[in-house]
Amino acid sequence: MATAVSRPCAGRSRDILWRVLGWRIVASIVWSVLFLPICTTVFIIFSRIDLFHPIQWLSDSFSDLYSSYVIFYFLLLSVVIIIISIFNVEFYAVVPSIPCSRLALIGKIIHPQQLMHSFIHAAMGMVMAWCAAVITQGQYSFLVVPCTGTNSFGSPAAQTCLNEYHLFFLLTGAFMGYSYSLLYFVNNMNYLPFPIIQQYKFLRFRRSLLLLVKHSCVESLFLVRNFCILYYFLGYIPKAWISTAMNLHIDEQVHRPLDTVSGLLNLSLLYHVWLCGVFLLTTWYVSWILFKIYATEAHVFPVQPPFAEGSDECLPKVLNSNPPPIIKYLALQDLMLLSQYSPSRRQEVFSLSQPGGHPHNWTAISRECLNLLNGMTQKLILYQEAAATNGRVSSSYPVEPKKLNSPEETAFQTPKSSQMPRPSVPPLVKTSLFSSKLSTPDVVSPFGTPFGSSVMNRMAGIFDVNTCYGSPQSPQLIRRGPRLWTSASDQQMTEFSNPSPSTSISAEGKTMRQPSVIYSWIQNKREQIKNFLSKRVLIMYFFSKHPEASIQAVFSDAQMHIWALEGLSHLVAASFTEDRFGVVQTTLPAILNTLLTLQEAVDKYFKLPHASSKPPRISGSLVDTSYKTLRFAFRASLKTAIYRITTTFGEHLNAVQASAEHQKRLQQFLEFKE
């Protein structure tokens, strides 16, 4: 039954994904192919450069441009660009994958999907290098050439020889294709950063074009250098294999072998290979840039569908369903934009249903925003729990964060003073927040995100407590003083050592048994092995966790939380004058409670020893690294959202029922002391 229900959901997800992104994908591919003739023309002109005869140089270049063989290779290059664009579509991600250790980075690179990506790009790079070598003409055009020397008996040689220059071109293209794929995942180039300021697509492309060409020229130079070093040591292997397989001779009388220093110092060869690399990287980066521009363009989701058939694409339905992650991001981006710039659409959010008079639109939108923000609070609490226990969270038992209550119990109920959760969470983790379920194999994800299981598989390694924050347990660490927080493993061991009627009696009425001698012996041996391995430098080099990567992983999906903050706060501020039915007033206490609790969790996070308080300076580069500073943008957006509400409502917020801690914190915002 579950499978039958999930199939229609998957079908609806594919339908909405195609309706929203289908034309964008097609348009980006078409423009990538249309940009190819410009790149090909520039490549032909620079490959035949002759500064002493400029008129002859330009006339020959344009005459070759219209020749039949160039048109054929142009069609072949178009197929390559389409394949590269398809891989851009298949491997994109709205949440960057951040490995927390060098071993995790290696595992990310050798993943089967990544290996397939690298193999295809190496093959496409070889095809593009072959086309570039043939278009260049001259001594680089053919792999097999007639030998010019004589045989050992003194008669003219009739054999065919291997053209090592052409082989060098092909191998360089394969190397550049593989390097592009490797850097594609190492630098998170599949990550789609959404622009902060909405601009026209042409302006975004024009702004990136000069940086793209500069990046391609520099990267091609470094890749040619790396390949020359590699070919110097290992170039004889492919040369000997191809000459043996094709029964070709190697003519060393005309051209020096390229696996020597003198052979590699051929400036003409290096120039044409570098130019081929620039051509390859530029065309691939253009398709990549165009897909990013089209995929991250704002999309308008109707708040109220004009027809019943279009209800699946309305904003409240998309936010509360389980759409593909990019659709979720586009919906939250649209919520942020409508809350600021569209009074008519805000009225649709505040409207009541007919008949019935229920604020379904506001209820659905605010519920999802509060769930996202509560999920971020839970994630920060989990991270602080791991940091407080020196990165040690028990792997014997799954740790499950407290599930968010239903909206009827939390988000849409005016909190009583006796029922308000304490905003200051020292101890930041309460015993009811994490529960050890020994018989449940599944662990509830701490993300609190609306993404499906397939997306979570793609996000594997982004936030894994045992992966990112684990550290070898040593007796010195275990014997440290009293800790600020309580982990599930400590609670479990306390229950073993100090049994009480509430903990020693199971649900079936049976007494829990003490740990056996075998179990204690296994645990002791495991600790000894960990201590032994932690003293080995090479092992710790691969297994040690990078604190900055762990911090970035916590806020890797913070962009949608930023949009939820901005959208919710702008709607609440606008409701002061635009909400005719008072639908926002019923949820205002819950919204303030969520924001203030999250604010306290963020403040406690930034007070951790390894959490930097200032964003690093990011230089302008083609590869986007804005995800590294999302935590600072999230902190600023959260504080701005609270100030936006307090400055709008002013002293009216004193009538909102809240706990004493929240009232004190709210007063600081009202007095601009926060």
UniProtKB/Swiss-Prot annotation:
Role description: Component of the nuclear pore complex (NPC), which plays a key role in de novo assembly and insertion of NPC in the nuclear envelope. Required for NPC and nuclear envelope assembly, possibly by forming a link between the nuclear envelope membrane and soluble nucleoporins, thereby anchoring the NPC in the membrane.
Keywords of the record: Membrane, mRNA transport, Nuclear pore complex, Nucleus, Phosphoprotein, Protein transport, Translocation, Transmembrane, Transmembrane helix, Transport
Further comment found in the protein's record: Depletion of NDC1 from HeLa cells interferes with the assembly of phenylalanine-glycine (FG) repeat Nups into nuclear pore complexes.
GO CC term, one of those recorded: nuclear envelope
UniProt-listed GO biological process terms: homologous chromosome pairing at meiosis; mRNA transport; nuclear pore complex assembly; nuclear pore localization; nuclear pore organization; nucleocytoplasmic transport; protein transport; spermatogenesis
Subcellular location: Nucleus, Nuclear pore complex; Nucleus membrane
InterPro entries in alphabetical order: Nucleoporin_prot_Ndc1/Nup
Signal peptide stretch: none
Ranges in the topological domain labelled Cytoplasmic: 1-24, 90-114, 187-225, 294-674
Ranges per topology, Perinuclear space: 46-68, 136-165, 247-272
Family statement: Belongs to the NDC1 family.
Segments for region (Disordered): 394-425
Modified residues (Phosphothreonine): T414, T440, T449
Residue(s) carrying Phosphoserine: S406, S439, S445, S471, S474
Native source organism of the sequence: Homo sapiens
Subunit structure of this chain's protein: Interacts with the NUP35/NUP53. Interacts with AAAS, anchoring it to the nuclear envelope.
TM region(s), chain numbering: 25-45, 69-89, 115-135, 166-186, 226-246, 273-293
Stated name of the protein: Nucleoporin NDC1
Domain of life: Eukaryota
